[in-house]
Design a protein with these regions (language model features):
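Bacterial N-terminal signal peptides that target proteins for export
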Residues: 2-8
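Extended, hydrophobic interaction surfaces within ordered domains
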Residues: 4, 18-21
Length: 183
C-alpha cells in the first residue's frame, strides 16, 4: 500500500509539472508577420543609422531592446512638429504608424526573421506635444495599432504614451520597444 501511494504521488506531481510547463505559442502555423506586412502593402526599409554613441538594438538572452526611432518617411524626411499646435492628432497618429514600420524594420535587421518575435513586451511612445496637449495615447495608438495588426496577439504590449517639451530635430514622435524573441 505504501508503494502504491508513492506511485500515485509521483504520478500526480508529474501531472502538475506537465501542466505548469510553458506553452510554446509560436507553433501557430498562421503566424507570419512578413506576410501580414505584404497584405497591408507595407515594405520594410533599411534602419536608419544611429546619430550618436548607441546602437539600433541590443539582444540580451531572449530580450531584444530597440532604440528610439522616429517617423522617417521613405523620401528620407522626418515628420516634424508639435502635436496640438503644428500637427493634428491624425498627423501624429500617422507619424507613430510610420515609426512602427521603422521599428519593425529594425527588428527584422536584428533577428533576420520576424517569425522569431515571440512577444512585444513594452512600447514607450514619446510625443512632441504642445504644452496644453493631453491626447498622447491617441497619437501612440498609431504605433500600437500597427504592431498588433502585424504580430497579432503576440503584438499586444504594455505601453507608456507621454508628452515631451521637445524631441531631437523636432520630430513628431520617438518610440522605443522591448521584445521577447526566439533563436
Amino acid at each position: 500500500k505504501m508503494r502504491t501511494n508513492k506511485i500515485i504521488y509521483i504520478f500526480i506531481i508529474s501531472l502538475i509539472m506537465v501542466a505548469c510547463e510553458p506553452v510554446d505559442t509560436q507553433t501557430d502555423s498562421n503566424y507570419d508577420p512578413e506576410l501580414k506586412l505584404k497584405e497591408l502593402g507595407i515594405e520594410l526599409t533599411t534602419p536608419s543609422s544611429p546619430v550618436a554613441n548607441y546602437v539600433n538594438s541590443v539582444r540580451s538572452g531572449n530580450l531584444l531592446f530597440i532604440s528610439g526611432k522616429g517617423p522617417l518617411k521613405n523620401d528620407g524626411n522626418y515628420i516634424k512638429g508639435k502635436v496640438g499646435s503644428d500637427l493634428t492628432i491624425e498627423q501624429g497618429y500617422e507619424a507613430a504608424r510610420i515609426t512602427a514600420v521603422n521599428l519593425i524594420s529594425t527588428i527584422k535587421a536584428s533577428v533576420g526573421d520576424l517569425k522569431k518575435v515571440k512577444r512585444v513586451l513594452k512600447v514607450t511612445g514619446m510625443v512632441n506635444a504642445a504644452p496644453n496637449f493631453t491626447d498622447h495615447p491617441k497619437v501612440v495608438n498609431g504605433c500600437s495599432d500597427l504592431i498588433v495588426e502585424v504580430f497579432g496577439d503576440k503584438g499586444k504590449h504594455t505601453r507608456a504614451a507621454v508628452g515631451m517639451g521637445s524631441l531631437p530635430s523636432n520630430i513628431a514622435v520617438e518610440i522605443d520597444m522591448i521584445l521577447e524573441v526566439m533563436d
